[in-house]
């Protein structure tokens, strides 16, 4: 195991072992214990009481974080004609059809989100093995298969993110940067949590939100009290 840096060990020392922090305290502590010299990303991971192998327990959706993630997403749009022009005007980073499909089939995935018009999904669907594992496949349920590509691009650039529970029943969200105000981080955390709770499958039995952890890019994990579900009321 690689030896931890002195900065990391100092960060760990500030976190009370076995304690579950309120969300507001957790994000403040994450800012205070960031061992990196750069403006690190702050992420939250939720462990859910679901079995993602069962279709009726797959938790997937979108959320618009009120303060964004701290970085501007690189958006790719599969479109032609007027819709391609609309995507370009909206600020899409990559726009095309067959050319992009061929490039992605070769393994290129240097973008953060993908949008497609319905008429191109027959071709885009063939990229499932490349885009699927990276959660980049356009999907009508997340608003990324649409004729209104400009709206989709604007929402993604404005902080809308897609999420899907992984095979270990975890969900991961970027909620901002260390440089964010603490209240901004709390409000982003609350937006993510509210949507996760709203999407609880009816077939999920027992405790749904089992664990929550806040961390910076290279920082230690900070356990958040999973019983606090009304975050802004308790902040």
From Swiss-Prot:
One of its GO terms (biological process) is regulation of translation. It comes from the Bacteria. GO terms for molecular function: rRNA binding; structural constituent of ribosome; tRNA binding. InterPro entries: Ribosom_uL1_bac-type, Ribosomal_uL1, Ribosomal_uL1-like, Ribosomal_uL1/biogenesis, Ribosomal_uL1_3-a/b-sand, Ribosomal_uL1_CS. The keyword tRNA-binding applies. Keywords: Repressor, Ribonucleoprotein, Ribosomal protein, RNA-binding, rRNA-binding, Translation regulation, tRNA-binding. It holds the Pfam family Ribosomal_L1. GO terms for cellular component: large ribosomal subunit. Binds directly to 23S rRNA. The L1 stalk is quite mobile in the ribosome, and is involved in E site tRNA release. Protein L1 is also a translational repressor protein, it controls the translation of the L11 operon by binding to its mRNA. NCBIfam families: rplA_bact. Part of the 50S ribosomal subunit. Belongs to the universal ribosomal protein uL1 family. This is Large ribosomal subunit protein uL1. It comes from Renibacterium salmoninarum (strain ATCC 33209 / DSM 20767 / JCM 11484 / NBRC 15589 / NCIMB 2235). The lineage of its organism: Bacteria, Bacillati, Actinomycetota, Actinomycetes, Micrococcales. The gene is rplA.
């Amino acid at each position: 195991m690689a030896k931890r840096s002195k900065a990391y060990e100092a960060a760990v020392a500030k976190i009370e072992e076995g304690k579950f922090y309120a969300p507001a305290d957790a994000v403040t502590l994450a800012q205070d214990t960031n061992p990196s010299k750069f403006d690190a990303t702050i992420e939250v991971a939720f462990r859910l009481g679901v079995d993602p192998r069962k279709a009726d327990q797959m938790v997937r959706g979108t959320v618009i974080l009120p303060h964004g993630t701290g970085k501007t997403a690189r958006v790719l749009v599969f479109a032609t004609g007027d819709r391609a022009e609309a995507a370009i005007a909206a600020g899409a980073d990559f726009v095309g059809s067959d050319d992009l499909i061929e490039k992605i089939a070769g393994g290129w995935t240097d973008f953060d989100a993908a949008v497609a018009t319905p008429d191109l999904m027959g071709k885009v669907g063939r990229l499932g093995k490349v885009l699927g594992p990276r959660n980049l496949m356009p999907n009508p349920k997340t608003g990324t298969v649409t004729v209104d590509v400009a709206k989709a691009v604007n929402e993604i650039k404005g902080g809308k993110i897609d999420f899907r529970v992984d095979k270990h029943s975890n969900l991961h969200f970027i909620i901002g940067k260390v440089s964010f105000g603490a209240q901004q981080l709390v409000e982003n955390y609350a937006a993510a949590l509210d949507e996760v709770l709203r999407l609880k499958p009816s077939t999920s039995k027992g405790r749904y939100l089992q664990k929550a952890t806040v961390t910076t890019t290279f920082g230690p994990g900070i356990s958040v009290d999973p019983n606090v579900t009304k975050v802004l009321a308790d902040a």
